[in-house]
Amino acid sequence: MEAIAKHDFSATADDELSFRKTQILKILNMEDDSNWYRAELDGKEGLIPSNYIEMKNHDWYYGRITRADAEKLLSNKHEGAFLIRISESSPGDFSLSVKCPDGVQHFKVLRDAQSKFFLWVVKFNSLNELVEYHRTASVSRSQDVKLRDMIPEEMLVQALYDFVPQESGELDFRRGDVITVTDRSDENWWNGEIGNRKGIFPATYVTPYHS
């Protein structure tokens, strides 16, 4: 994933990475610490404060969705429909789930010593570049399957727990409530609505809704 720096940051430790406002950083790992992400800039890797950046929003990035939920989501979609998610078996890595003619297939996104991403031979500086390339080149070696965006649709989720707002602008709900997600560009806090009530809520409090 890629992110845009919102502020300048000067490293104060050897494992941190300095950057300037508006620079584009490649995010390598968001899982170990929600406050510090591992990133790369100009061939250098290090930790960066997550509140100093803004993730570039992509509809195909679903974050911590399970393999099973990815299959449910893609099973009735058109051929080539896809999403990228955080790997369940290897946290910090990514998987590409794609609707193929014979069902949903999952491809592990590999990474070399230079942190370049690849599925087969051609390597890329970012997930964004990998996705764009495979819009015109098959992701599969056994059949011709090119990536195509899912037709946009509202995402429904169901509350796993009660949520009582602590700040204005947050959405109150009870366990079992069904919420329409209107924006999930932030990994931790999503925008949603229940009836005519709108607000933000913690993404960890909900699960994909299956009627």
Curated annotation (Swiss-Prot):
Tissue: Found mainly in the developing eye and in the antennal disk. Also observed in other imaginal disks tested and in the embryo. Expressed in Johnston's organ, the hearing organ, neurons (at protein level).
Annotated localization: Membrane; Synapse
Effect of residue 85 to K: Disrupts the SH2 domain. Does not affect binding to Dab
Protein's job: Adapter protein which modulates signaling mediated by several receptor tyrosine kinases such as sev and Ack. Required for proper signaling by sevenless. May act to stimulate the ability of Sos to catalyze Ras1 activation by linking sevenless and Sos in a signaling complex. Required for functional and morphological integrities of the scolopidia, sensory neurons and the antennal mechanosensory and motor center (AMMC) brain neuropil. Required for Ack-dependent suppression of apoptosis in the eye.
Gene Ontology CC annotation, any one: protein-containing complex
Record note on quaternary structure: Interacts with autophosphorylated sev via SH2 domain and Sos, Dos and Dab via SH3 domains. Binds to tyrosine phosphorylated Dab via the SH2 domain. Interacts with phosphorylated Ack.
Entry keywords, A to Z: Membrane, Repeat, SH2 domain, SH3 domain, Synapse, Transducer
Outcome recorded upon mutating residue 49 to L: Inactivates the SH3 domain. Abolishes binding to Dab
Residue span(s) of domain SH3: 1-58, 152-211
Pfam families noted in UniProt: SH2 (PF00017), SH3_1 (PF00018)
Alphabetized GO MF terms: epidermal growth factor receptor binding; phosphotyrosine residue binding; sevenless binding; signaling receptor complex adaptor activity
Family that this chain belongs to: Belongs to the GRB2/sem-5/DRK family.
Disulfide-linked positions: none
Topology within the bilayer: Peripheral membrane protein
Impact upon substituting residue 67 to H: In Su(sevs11)R1 mutant; ommatidial cell development obstruction
One of the GO biological process terms: follicle cell of egg chamber development
Domain SH2: 60-151
Record-annotated membrane-spanning stretches: none
Organism, scientific name: Drosophila melanogaster (Fruit fly)
Outcome of gene disruption: Embryonically lethal. Loss in Johnston's organ causes scolopidium abnormalities.
Protein name: Growth factor receptor-bound protein 2
Outcome, altering residue 199 to R: Disrupts the SH3 domain. Abolishes binding to Dab
